[in-house]
Amino acid sequence: LKGHFLLISTAKTYIEIPFRYRLAGKLKLHKFLPSSFLRKPQWITYYLFGVVTRDARKLLREILRDTDLQFSQWAINQILNWKNLNLPESYIHVHGTEDRLLPNGNAQIYIEEAGHLMILTHSSQINKIIDDFLLSVNSSSKQ
């Protein structure tokens, strides 16, 4: 694993943000999203985040409950209106095959049957990738 940036469950450029999100940003549709949608997960929330187990659903409920509402609204606005076209010079991109929140077909490493919360639901696989990444960065910096 050679690279200087480790990107997990994300998009590298705005082109990887689904068109429907970019369109929603242009039309400012997210401004009409009720705050209850950001606080209390609905079936669509579970679907988008790819959580299927009872424990994962409980964890997502806790995360949403504990997340600052203003931060959530700010973050959604930033994602929907992001215009980055610059790729990092050197990176490793890790993505879940079942990530419906940010579906992506341009990663170098895919975690099978993993959704957007794969750092929690597939933590042993992600930890191994992080360990390998840190070892490669450390060994390349010594050369």
Task: Locate the predicted segments by residue.
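Short beta-strand/loop motif that positions the catalytic acidic residue
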Residues: 93-95, 99
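Catalytic histidine-centered segment of alpha/beta-hydrolase-like enzymes
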Residues: 114-129
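Flexible "cap/lid" loop of the alpha/beta hydrolase fold
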Residues: 3-36
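Short, proline-enriched alpha-helix->beta-strand connector loops that line the catalytic pocket
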Residues: 87-91, 103-107
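C-terminal alpha-helix
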Residues: 129-140
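Active-site loop signature of alpha/beta-hydrolase-fold enzymes
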Residues: 13, 100, 117
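Short glycine-/acidic-enriched loop or helix-start segments at secondary-structure transitions
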Residues: 1, 16-17, 102-105
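Conserved alpha/beta-hydrolase catalytic His-Asp/Glu region
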Residues: 37-84
